Amino acid sequence: MSEQPVYGAAAEAPKPRVKVRTHHLHKWKAEGHKWAMLTAYDYSTAAVFDEAEIPVLLVGDSAANVVYGYDTTVPVTLDELIPLVRGVVRGAPHALVVADLPFGSYEAGPQQALATATRMLKETGAHAVKLEGGERVADQIAAVSAAGIPVMAHIGFTPQSVNGLGGFRVQGRGDAAEQTIHDAIAVQEAGAFAVVMEMVPAELATQITGKLTIPTVGIGAGPSCDAQVLVWQDMAGMTNGKTAKFVKRFGAVGDELRRAASDYAREVATGAFPADEHSY
């Protein structure tokens, strides 16, 4: 006869975490399970987000703004993004890591897109790429997907096209809604495994999410999308000044970092640091 534990049932061993793959995202959509995506740009931050069990990390071309200090995402290059992606991949062993293809690296056609995506995966270890546009980049998505590289699409407001769109404006209002729907269907048919919808009216995003079999990832697209994404500095309160309407701050990391830096500088100036316990 087997022995029974004296004080209650034995605790079950925790299940090992599973590496997130694209098929998990499709399964979650079918089950109605919503998930979160965050940007990440370095090893240390990626490790924190992986510990927080964020399933998908995006090394976005938003690095142009929050890492390199550009006003838009247009100037950032492939060579500038690749080292960032490497760090994120190393820091997040469980997350699906998606790497943005920067402006100018895929628009010329399918062959350019495939060459850029191939280089990105070979040199970084990323698991998927993201590119902006709907029907106009369907051929690029098809070529990259056919080569076995998962593609996340991006429709609605596309930051790389900010100059052509006349600034940061909501997309898909009025007559433009039909084109946004066409874009969503086009990227799905081209082989995208998911699609980001940015600054799209919530009602339209709900309609598109219901039409597609692939997950929709909202950023300023209302609550009905299958997932949500934010730039981590916006989410955690790292950035100063005015943020977009769709941003909610879940922390005050910037304030805490400033406090820590000020305390450190003060203790160095007064001789309080390093103390005996910090010395050999």
Swiss-Prot record:
Essential cofactor(s): Mg(2+)
Pathway(s) annotated for this protein in UniProt: Cofactor biosynthesis; (R)-pantothenate biosynthesis; (R)-pantoate from 3-methyl-2-oxobutanoate: step 1/2
The protein's Enzyme Commission number: 2.1.2.11
Binding site for 3-methyl-2-oxobutanoate: 61-62, 100, 130
Active site: 198 (proton acceptor)
Class of the enzyme per the UniProt entry, highest EC level: transferase
Location relative to the cell: Cytoplasm
Cofactor note: Binds 1 Mg(2+) ion per subunit.
Primary location group: cytoplasm
One GO MF term attached to the UniProt entry: magnesium ion binding
Keyword set, alphabetical order: Cytoplasm, Magnesium, Metal-binding, Pantothenate biosynthesis, Transferase
Any Pfam family hit: Pantoate_transf
Sites where the protein binds Mg(2+): 61, 100, 132
Record's function text: Catalyzes the reversible reaction in which hydroxymethyl group from 5,10-methylenetetrahydrofolate is transferred onto alpha-ketoisovalerate to form ketopantoate.
Family: Belongs to the PanB family.
Protein name as it appears in the record: 3-methyl-2-oxobutanoate hydroxymethyltransferase
Species name: Mycolicibacterium vanbaalenii (strain DSM 7251 / JCM 13017 / BCRC 16820 / KCTC 9966 / NRRL B-24157 / PYR-1) (Mycobacterium vanbaalenii)
Lineage of source species: Bacteria, Bacillati, Actinomycetota, Actinomycetes, Mycobacteriales
Gene, per the UniProt record: panB
